[in-house]
Amino acid sequence: MTIMRKSHPLMKMVNHAFIDLPAPSNISSWWNFGSLLGLCLIIQIASGLFLAMHYTSDTISAFSSVAHICRDVNYGWLIRYIHANGASLFFICLYLHIGRGIYYGSYLYKETWNIGIMLLFLTMATAFMGYVLPWGQMSFWGATVITNLLSAIPYVGTDLVEWIWGGFSVDKATLTRFFAFHFILPFIIAATAMVHLLFLHETGSNNPLGIPSDSDKIPFHPYYTLKDFLGVILVLALFLTFVLFFPDLLGDPDNYSPANPLNTPPHIKPEWYFLFAYAILRSIPNKLGGVIALVLSILVLALFPLLHTANQRSMMFRPISQFLFWTLVSDLFILTWIGGQPVEPPFIIIGQIASILYFSIILLLLPIAGLIENKILKW
């Protein structure tokens, strides 16, 4: 008699994806972030569901309903802070996951990589709309400034912005639709993540050496289920420590003031995980140019498979590319810092140099480094 997990139609799918899946024997902890992103999504959907039970998407009562959740709902404060900081954890895991993909050449699985970029866009859209919901000062002005960027699109821009707003300014209609989209998008993300995994399992995982691992595979369970579980325990411990001891560290104090259309905050800025893109947007003095640079700062990831010139897949044995990769990481830290600073010297020029360097490394220097390394290694 066949084992149930190998014969039952539903169990068979789970078995092929998480139990009998052949996995490379040498994948490191950098491969843990995929499962951690799944964990983040589950945490966000669960905590978000409980918040939605008590939240009111109305301009008059939205801010009060969040205060009510924190004060009057049993463990409401905990659910709210788990959800708010869960977004930060989500983006930390997301950026590390993308960084791993770039370093080890995982982007050569084109379908998986492109679905991943779609997931990044969906997650960014979800996070942006979620930030608007508490209806604090930074929520309101962040929504106004970011949606207003679409008015830079020639001819249809203004109509498009008013269509998104549902009126002539960010108001009740905007808040209601943002809540609706913020609720539905995580489920779309979950479905897209399934497609991401489907494409990944067509090819199998990459590994740190960037060489085919068909000759040395091990079953996913128990080896990687246990390894992923260890990652989950460690990350949850760090996450809960952060939530319980420093819940407001990453938030903006302005968001503790109710939204006021008549009073603009001195420095409008998004959450920390968007600051690098915000810095690139601000580094170009032209509105349309800035919007194009903003979109390209993420879309440029799609060019990685096309710009891969090296004969080796991974950067593990490519010192020049390694140096450029870590320069790119440092550059992103600088852009994140600049995104949170006011638009004044010397921050303007630092932001512009960092933005030029960001695109130069990806579009020019890494492909050249690949060719040089081919020559050095006589490939």
UniProtKB/Swiss-Prot annotation:
Write the record's keywords in alphabetical order, separated by commas.
Answer: Electron transport, Heme, Iron, Membrane, Metal-binding, Mitochondrion, Mitochondrion inner membrane, Respiratory chain, Transmembrane, Transmembrane helix, Transport, Ubiquinone
Q: Which GO terms describe its biological process?
A: mitochondrial electron transport, ubiquinol to cytochrome c
* A GO MF label: ubiquinol-cytochrome-c reductase activity
Q: Where in the cell is it found?
A: Mitochondrion inner membrane
Instruction: Read off the Pfam families from this record.
Output: Cytochrom_B_C, Cytochrome_B
Cofactor(s), names only, from the UniProt record: heme b
- How does the entry describe its membrane topology? Multi-pass membrane protein
- Annotated a ubiquinone binding sites: 201
Q: How is the cofactor bound?
A: Binds 2 heme b groups non-covalently.
Residues where heme b b562 binds: 83, 182
Asked if the record carries the keyword Transport, the reply is yes
Membrane-spanning regions, if any?
33-53, 77-98, 113-133, 178-198, 226-246, 288-308, 320-340, 347-367
CDD domains with a match to the protein in the record? cytochrome_b_C, Cytochrome_b_N
Its UniProt miscellaneous note says: Heme 1 (or BL or b562) is low-potential and absorbs at about 562 nm, and heme 2 (or BH or b566) is high-potential and absorbs at about 566 nm.
Give the function comment from the record.
Component of the ubiquinol-cytochrome c reductase complex (complex III or cytochrome b-c1 complex) that is part of the mitochondrial respiratory chain. The b-c1 complex mediates electron transfer from ubiquinol to cytochrome c. Contributes to the generation of a proton gradient across the mitochondrial membrane that is then used for ATP synthesis.
Q: How does it assemble?
A: The cytochrome bc1 complex contains 11 subunits: 3 respiratory subunits (MT-CYB, CYC1 and UQCRFS1), 2 core proteins (UQCRC1 and UQCRC2) and 6 low-molecular weight proteins (UQCRH/QCR6, UQCRB/QCR7, UQCRQ/QCR8, UQCR10/QCR9, UQCR11/QCR10 and a cleavage product of UQCRFS1). This cytochrome bc1 complex then forms a dimer.
Protein name (Swiss-Prot/TrEMBL):
Cytochrome b
Species whose genome carries this gene:
Chaetodipus eremicus
* Organism lineage string: Eukaryota, Metazoa, Chordata, Craniata, Vertebrata
The gene designation is MT-CYB
